[in-house]
């Protein structure tokens, strides 16, 4: 049931429902009762992931083609990879949670109205208020009708109700951070020597190089290789809280030998 007088939700036993996420309400994330004791508490905590990769390393490619007549092309590429490591995306947790509905800030699109489960209609009306009975509460048939109405209003919702009183780390924000990154690429062209003789140049090579040109990863954050700094533990690994991604660089140049 729901009591609008104190804005609290109650279970079938008449007791207020509270979880480690704070006061419960329809549409909230449901946590698994690992111990089976009928209550979700600190005893239900489990290991959510591993920041250490199962396999990591790198490999390179080198390619040369051409001759003295038309010049020589060269290409080198260096790749790095990691498989099996996981990252806690605290940025997604922070920007995907609303701690005070009157203080929305920098929230992600998946918790926008129409995408998140909400107790409010599009016109701003509070749905439970439409089903308050003569006893001043939403209960019995009124509660069932409210649940049905909420199901209609939230038919297209793709994420749970993000309004929460507390933060709880769940596997929703633990992501696979495996990746394949093109760490470095160089493409060069060495001009034929016969073209350079008149300029008294022995060899001339034009090149382009770049670093961190692309990264293939299922991770939804800015970069799976995060550098973490937290107030609690500055040495923590595998935690992304608005960490800067690796920079990308481009270079053009020419090598001359006289």
Regions inferred by a protein language model and the residue ranges of each:
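Outer/extracellular conduits and scaffolds centered on Gram-negative outer-membrane beta-barrels
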Residues: 1-258
